[in-house]
Amino acid sequence: MTCLTVLLDPGRLKRGVGPNRMLGPPLKVGERYMLAVGPGMIDANGRPLRERFTKAFTVCEAVRAAIAIEDWRVLPPKADSRDPLELTFPTSLDWAGLWQGIIVVSGGGEQISGRVGIDQDEMRWRFTPDAAWQAGFHSIRISPDLEDACGNTPYGAFDGPFRSAEQISLETTVRSVPFEVKGARGRT
């Protein structure tokens, strides 16, 4: 598992604040960048990396809207199988957040144990249960902390308008997306 979070000055990212107005955004749209991490850097477990890692990327226009869960595509599995539940997203989501920010819950409310897989540039999330799927309704629970690459959450844009304490308290609730497991694999 490879994960590195690069934090850029929020003042350079948010529109209309001092650092952004004076210096502009830290990355330029259309430019290609290469992130390189050399051997010897300490990983999350306190061990030095053995080899160099690189990831190339091109900067696109910032997404300045909440994550639209209603635009996700849910492909439910077939009952009595261990086929994966598959979610596809219209844009990439935060890789680290996808591992912990989405769980699957049975119709009875218990978390279903299984393995998560993430691919297609963080635009597909797959969950393979440890035991066969039971027919019926289940739900996908989405953490309010899940972010896309621009820092947007299911509750709002990273640089959205000021929100009241009441609005912020609503943002701590977990969103749920129901899905049905039937006898034959189908789309919802």
Where are these regions (language model features)?
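Acidic, low-complexity Ser/Thr/Gly/Pro-rich repeat segments typical of extracellular/periplasmic
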Residues: M1-T188
